[in-house]
């Protein structure tokens, strides 16, 4: 649909969309007068996941389910998304700020020959143009930007936009497009599964406990993790702690890493 706002689904790799998608779909529906559509690249979609996207406000789910989409490789996602966008001609393509969406959406915008507004914190329609507000200069200023042509491509900072209210029983059309799955030019030499801490992710947490050099070593982060489990917080780390190898890069909360909008 030419006026549709696409929402690129970020999931937990187990067939469940992350809760940040309620924000993305809710904002897309608001801006497009209810013409929000979800685009899901996955190797294992679930009926519960499709139901959740519909209840958050997606009118249609473009489902590309193929083993080639996991583990994530940007070249495969980009090729499939670009071909689908050329056929369906969406007005806008929105995605949450996550590690893989940062890379994928940037490559997709370049492939489509359009601009990208990253880390957006607000949107408004100005006639038939979309205006995005995004931080610049390490968050010291806010800039309003727009696009020379559609599709308008943007990433949304999590925990900023109002999540869509779930509408139990709402249904969406599920479209399984027949687009080619690109052949990967890269191969995995080794794959290591991350061990779950059982704590909220930085991008979705309302409370973050962060430790830096003062932790004196990686073994002391268990103190923060124990406290985080009690209060329902996520655990982050400073750049110095990450550079020292005390915590993985996904825990870094300073410029260039995880984008979080915690309350505490």
Predicted regions and their residues:
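N-terminal glycine-rich FAD/FM-binding segment characteristic of electron-transfer flavoproteins
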Residues: 1-263
């Amino acid at each position: 649909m030419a006026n549709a706002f696409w929402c690129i689904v970020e999931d937990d790799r187990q067939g469940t969309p992350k809760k940040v998608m309620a924000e993305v779909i809710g904002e897309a529906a608001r801006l497009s007068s209810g013409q929000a559509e979800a685009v899901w690249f996955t190797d294992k979609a679930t009926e519960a996941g499709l139901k959740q996207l519909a209840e958050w406000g997606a009118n249609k789910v473009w489902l590309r389910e193929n083993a080639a989409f996991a583990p994530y490789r940007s070249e495969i996602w980009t090729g499939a998304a670009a071909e689908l966008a050329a056929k369906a001609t969406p007005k806008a393509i929105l995605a949450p700020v996550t590690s893989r969406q940062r890379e994928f959406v940037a490559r997709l915008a370049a492939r489509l020959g359009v601009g990208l507004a990253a880390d957006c914190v607000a949107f408004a329609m100005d006639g038939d143009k979309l205006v995005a507000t995004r931080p610049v200069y390490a968050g010291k200023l806010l800039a309003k930007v727009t696009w020379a042509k559609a599709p308008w491509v943007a990433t949304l900072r999590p925990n900023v936009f109002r999540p869509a209210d779930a509408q139990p029983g709402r249904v969406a059309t599920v479209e399984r497009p027949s687009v080619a799955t690109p052949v990967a030019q890269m191969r995995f030499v080794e794959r290591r599964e991350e061990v779950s801490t059982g704590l909220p992710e930085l991008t979705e947490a309302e409370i973050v406990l962060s430790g830096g050099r003062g932790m004196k070593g990686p073994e002391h982060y268990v103190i923060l993790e124990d406290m985080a489990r009690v209060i329902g917080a996520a655990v982050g780390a400073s750049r110095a702690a990450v550079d020292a190898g005390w915590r993985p890069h996904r825990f870094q909360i300073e410029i260039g890493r995880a984008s979080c909008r915690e309350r505490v």
